[in-house]
Amino acid sequence: MKVVEVKHPLVRHKIGLMREADISTKRFRELAAEVGSLLTYEATADLETETVTIEGWNGPVQVEQIKGKKVTVVPILRAGLGMMDGVLEHIPSARISVVGIYRDEETLEPVPYFEKLCSQVDERIALVVDPMLATGGSMISTIDLLKQRGCKQIKALVLVAAPEGLAALEKAHPDIELYTASIDRCLNENGYILPGLGDAGDKIFGTK
């Protein structure tokens, strides 16, 4: 599995701001989208382009445009919605596919409860977004579903990843790519990432 920890100064600065204990919902939400945007920039660097001729201001001109496969953004509910706008900033025509999964707080296992994938999802590059890769269960379950539906090119974008989650994801799906702003130290006994960001879903939506 290709793992890219994006170490751009802006990414490191913004993810550092997100770790503040008393950060406001508004600020956390803004930063989640901003870091999601920067991760998207890195994750799409290998998209193929083709030369096409368009009508410019002074006659025909050759330009490069994205060729071939289109993109679907796959936010894992609910926290993944906080990164979606950052992805769409760069790919506004992307289709949106939604997967609902929550983590059982006792077993730490993923529990699927909703899915709505876009048409022709099997012909698209899937960008799966979720702020936290802790145990990896939700991401693995989502990618399982996408592969069952025929997706062949899948990239995961997460704000923060734990080594345990990375190991589990690599074992389950060694053929995908993952982009993260930070690989953190470890999981605690409750399955939360240390130092982490806290509960990203609660911070994005202002709930507890």
UniProtKB/Swiss-Prot annotation:
Q: Which residues bind uracil?
A: 193, 198-200
Pfam families associated with the record: UPRTase
The answer, when asked if Membrane is one of the entry's keywords, is no
Q: Which UniProt keywords apply?
A: Allosteric enzyme, Glycosyltransferase, GTP-binding, Magnesium, Nucleotide-binding, Transferase
> What is the activity regulation entry?
Allosterically activated by GTP.
The protein's matches in InterPro entries, at most eight in alphabetical order, are given as: PRibTrfase_dom, PRTase-like, Upp_B, UPRTase/APRTase, Ura_phspho_trans
Q: What is its EC number?
A: 2.4.2.9
Q: Which CDD domains match?
A: PRTases_typeI
Q: Which PANTHER family match?
A: ADENINE PHOSPHORIBOSYLTRANSFERASE, URACIL PHOSPHORIBOSYLTRANSFERASE, CHLOROPLASTIC
Protein's name in the database: Uracil phosphoribosyltransferase
Q: What is the protein's species of origin?
A: Shewanella amazonensis (strain ATCC BAA-1098 / SB2B)
